[in-house]
Design a protein with these regions (language model features):
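Residue-identity detector for glycine
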Residues: 330-331
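Hydrophobic transmembrane helix bundles of membrane-integrated enzymes that assemble
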Residues: 1-196, 200, 213-220, 235-325, ...
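Internal helical hairpin/lid segments
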Residues: 207-212
């Protein structure tokens, strides 16, 4: 990720020079949001045992729950008020239980505990891991982010069918990079209102096209990565669109390539990263450093041989359908980690 940060800095310096402006301090902050969470996660992976990481995630879940209930509108009286529940609308993404602060952390905690809810090994409390899995599932749904809820439902269903230790072709990395680069270009045109004239973009994107229109008033001027926040006075709330418009398409492709390279070829890691990119396409998650640290810990631990080295086993749930997609080993369905973690 350090070379990616250097690339973003060089391109930012070029954009600032073209606009006859000095590079902004915000650029350094924005680049740190891309680079530091992965480096911190890698540090924790190498420093702590898997049992300690699971305990750390349990503490993180508890703290996130406290923060959730400290948010306005999440008091006990709000939850026992029937009128609040009656106003919930999935179509308009409206719910008093919604949380912009905690939603990403809860989803990534769910992704972590979903994988390790059946972990067996020294100093690992299986019961606590399963309780945390259920709690993180409930709070992910309560946070009422449609994409997160959709992925949670899909993961719970696929959990009965797919062996999460399975491998995907190495060619998926460039394929996903190209796919999300193209999707970002098209989504940018859609947000500008050029792709489907007459379509109600405002309601579909919950007002994010208005944020982009503020930038349009100054002809999308860029002084480098993160400069739009200074120019329009607020965050753009579309991470991939921001990289594309503030830097260029090369930076966008490099960003996608590096992140999917980190995910590697493990099925679960790729699904976790795919969610992150869909979220960055339609919303914003890079400012949420905590959620990214959790995501990188999940991805790195799943796609590395850390569990195997520490003699930790993942006992899969028995399912008739799953037997069609996975192999038996000595009459016992145990899966170990075997893929190396890709550090960039």
């Amino acid at each position: 990720l350090i070379p990616l940060g250097v690339l973003f800095l060089l391109l930012s310096m070029q954009r600032a020079s073209e606009a006859h402006h000095e590079i902004l301090f915000r650029t350094y902050v924005q680049i740190s949001l891309v680079v530091l969470p992965a480096l911190y996660a890698l540090f924790l992976i190498n420093l702590l045992k898997m049992s300690s990481l699971i305990k750390l995630m349990q503490i993180t879940l508890f703290c996130t729950i406290l923060i959730y209930f400290m948010e306005p509108g999440h008091g006990l009286l709000d939850f026992v008020n029937p009128s609040n529940w009656a106003k919930i609308s999935i179509i308009h993404s409206n719910s008093f239980t919604e949380s912009d602060i905690c939603s990403e952390a809860f989803f990534n905690l769910f992704a972590f505990f979903n994988f390790y809810k059946n972990a067996r090994g020294e100093e690992i409390n299986l019961k606590n891991a399963r309780v945390c899995y259920r709690i993180s599932l409930i709070f992910t749904i309560l946070c009422f982010k449609r994409l997160a809820m959709l992925f949670v439902i899909c993961i719970v269903i696929l959990d009965k069918v797919i062996d999460w230790r399975g491998q995907i072709s190495k060619y998926l990395v460039p394929l996903m990079s190209i796919l999300f680069t193209a999707a970002t270009v098209l989504y940018t045109e859609f947000m500008k209102g050029d792709l489907f004239p007459g379509f109600d973009v405002y309601n579909f994107t919950t007002g994010r096209d208005y944020i982009l229109s503020l930038w349009k008033r100054i002809d999308y001027i860029s002084y480098g990565y993160g400069s739009s926040m200074i120019l329009i006075g607020r965050y753009l709330e579309m991470d991939l669109v921001q990289i594309y418009m503030e830097l260029n398409i090369l930076a966008l492709f490099a960003f996608a390539f590096v992140f999917f390279k980190i995910a590697g070829t493990n099925v679960y890691s790729v699904i976790t990263m795919t969610y992150a990119f869909l979220n960055m396409l339609t919303a914003s998650s890079l400012p949420g450093s905590l959620s990214w640290v959790i995501a990188f810990i999940t991805i790195a631990s799943v796609s590395s041989d850390k569990c195997a080295r520490e003699q930790i086993y993942i006992s899969e749930q028995k399912s008739r359908m799953k037997k069609m997609f996975s192999k038996k080993k000595g009459g016992k369905r145990i899966v170990q980690t075997s893929v190396s973690y890709h550090s960039t």
